[in-house]
Regions:
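N-terminal and secondary-structure boundary signal
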Residues: 1-227
């Protein structure tokens, strides 16, 4: 099957009209997608970013409540496609393994959180990849104080997509802002320097996977904390 190349503009346009969707991305410098996991983000400046968009009309069991069985299958299909393998567990093994300490950087904003269901689905696959239970943690606002995240060798970055009064959009670039000792430092000029956050806290090397949830995205707000 011929691969279709989409631009960032194409991706954002499709995602904007796909409320029951998710997008996962990793980074590569080589032509083979199987090399993705071997390329840390810090080496991806002039390389390629591989993005998989997946949708299912049954992804929600209710208002803002994920259908775990469906989303579990969606994530498996997306990971297999992203890493060009038939077994989704093998895809996870390409980015984490028994020697890793893995932090899942979630988002707990009460109006539109990542949800415990999604966090559980991701954690299950991390464990399936051979990471021990005590070496997996999930956190958001406490990542700087969390001993596991301080030692984490791999980070899975996951959050819902939503509008944001300062940055325009709250997505995967913004999600690690809680690693900063002073998040407001990134707010001036519509968060113009937000991407520089990734130059600190070893994020470029430690973040192995970005998952943007578009199951119930927020497209409009009237203030910094509105919903």
């Amino acid at each position: 099957m011929k691969t279709k190349i989409i631009t960032r503009r194409d991706f954002l346009r499709v995602a904007a009209v796909s409320p029951v969707a998710g997008a996962i991305a990793s980074y590569q410098n080589k032509s083979s997608s199987k090399d993705i996991a071997k390329q840390p983000v810090s080496q991806a400046g002039t390389g390629k970013i591989r993005v998989v968009l997946i949708r299912d009309e049954n992804a929600l069991a209710g208002f803002k409540k994920p259908n775990e069985e469906v989303v579990d299958r969606m994530l498996d299909e997306a990971m297999a496609s992203l890493f060009d393998v038939s077994d989704p567990v093998q895809a996870w093994k390409d980015i984490v393994g028994p020697t890793d300490i893995v932090g899942v950087k979630s988002n707990v904003w009460r109006y539109l959180p990542t949800t415990r269901e999604i966090e559980g689905i991701i954690k299950k696959r991390i464990l399936d990849a051979g990471v021990s239970e005590e070496s997996v943690g999930v956190d958001d606002r406490g990542v700087r104080r969390d001993p596991l995240f301080q030692k984490a060798t791999a980070i899975i970055n996951v959050r819902p997509g939503r509008t944001h009064d300062w940055s325009g959009i709250g997505g995967c670039i913004k999600n690690p802002i809680m690693f900063s000792p002073s998040p407001p430092d990134y707010h001036p000029d519509s968060c113009a320097d937000l991407a520089t956050l990734w130059d600190h806290h070893n994020l470029r090397d430690r973040v192995k996977l970005n998952i943007l949830l578009m199951l119930s995205p927020q497209f409009h707000s009237t203030g910094p904390h509105s919903y």
